[in-house]
């Protein structure tokens, strides 16, 4: 996995896919991301909601994030899929919020072997909430090496969205390693906005 930039698109998924096919993107398959809130069984200010996430690119992993004000201070973990089974046994403390679950399903494209673009429709239950695009630059895992190039790619391909860089791009000044948790944080932030849409 390289460095990813995730954003909500204003167009339909088909419109975004046509743009990608117009620049020579090849359809590689499907992808799925889910964002599942687990709330404290008793409402309390002492305990935060735990967000459990999965990405089809990492089929053996479960991502767990307790969102705070920003990514750096939020408790987070990468676990194996067995973590989901453990959560089921913690029903006395954490209760799954099925109504708040966001699923993103769509297609994965490859462009000139260096870029992977995932275009998915976000749903909450049976309600369509929006279109989410993930642009991944595969050759590097160092943000400072590629963020300007990624902004230029997004500007050239979509003619917008390039000015709203992900939080991790803005706070990273040193050559730090990008991880899948950084991608999942971006999905979490978008899912939080999508839940508020009517």
From Swiss-Prot:
<keyword id="KW-0804">Transcription</keyword>
<dbReference type="GO" id="GO:0006357">
    <property type="term" value="P:regulation of transcription by RNA polymerase II"/>
</dbReference>
<dbReference type="GO" id="GO:0016592">
    <property type="term" value="C:mediator complex"/>
</dbReference>
<dbReference type="InterPro" id="IPR013921">
    <property type="entry name" value="Mediator_Med20"/>
</dbReference>
<keyword id="KW-0010">Activator</keyword>
<comment type="function">
    <text>Component of the Mediator complex, a coactivator involved in the regulated transcription of nearly all RNA polymerase II-dependent genes. Mediator functions as a bridge to convey information from gene-specific regulatory proteins to the basal RNA polymerase II transcription machinery. Mediator is recruited to promoters by direct interactions with regulatory proteins and serves as a scaffold for the assembly of a functional preinitiation complex with RNA polymerase II and the general transcription factors.</text>
</comment>
<keyword id="KW-0539">Nucleus</keyword>
<keyword id="KW-0805">Transcription regulation</keyword>
<protein>
    <recommendedName>
        <fullName>Mediator of RNA polymerase II transcription subunit 20</fullName>
    </recommendedName>
</protein>
<comment type="similarity">
    <text>Belongs to the Mediator complex subunit 20 family.</text>
</comment>
<dbReference type="Pfam" id="PF08612">
    <property type="entry name" value="Med20"/>
</dbReference>
<comment type="subunit">
    <text>Component of the Mediator complex.</text>
</comment>
<dbReference type="GO" id="GO:0003713">
    <property type="term" value="F:transcription coactivator activity"/>
</dbReference>
């Amino acid at each position: 996995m390289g460095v990813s930039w995730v954003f909500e698109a204003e167009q339909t998924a088909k419109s975004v896919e046509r743009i990608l096919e117009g620049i020579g993107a090849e359809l590689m398959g499907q992808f799925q991301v889910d964002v599942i809130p687990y709330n404290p069984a008793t409402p309390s200010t002492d305990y935060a909601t735990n967000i459990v996430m999965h990405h089809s690119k990492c089929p053996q992993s479960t991502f767990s994030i307790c969102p705070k004000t920003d990514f750096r201070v939020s408790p987070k973990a990468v676990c194996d899929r067995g973590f989901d089974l453990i959560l089921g046994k913690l029903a006395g403390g954490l209760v799954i919020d099925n109504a708040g679950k966001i699923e993103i399903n769509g297609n994965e494209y490859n462009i000139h072997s260096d870029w992977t673009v995932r275009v998915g429709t976000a749903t909450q239950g049976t309600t369509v909430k929006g279109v989410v695009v993930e642009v991944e630059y595969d050759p590097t895992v160092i943000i400072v090496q590629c963020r300007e190039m990624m902004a230029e790619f997004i500007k050239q391909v979509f003619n917008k969205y390039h000015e709203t860089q992900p939080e991790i791009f803005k706070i990273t000044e040193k050559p730090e390693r990008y991880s899948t948790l950084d991608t999942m944080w971006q999905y979490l932030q978008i899912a939080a906005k999508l839940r508020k849409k009517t």
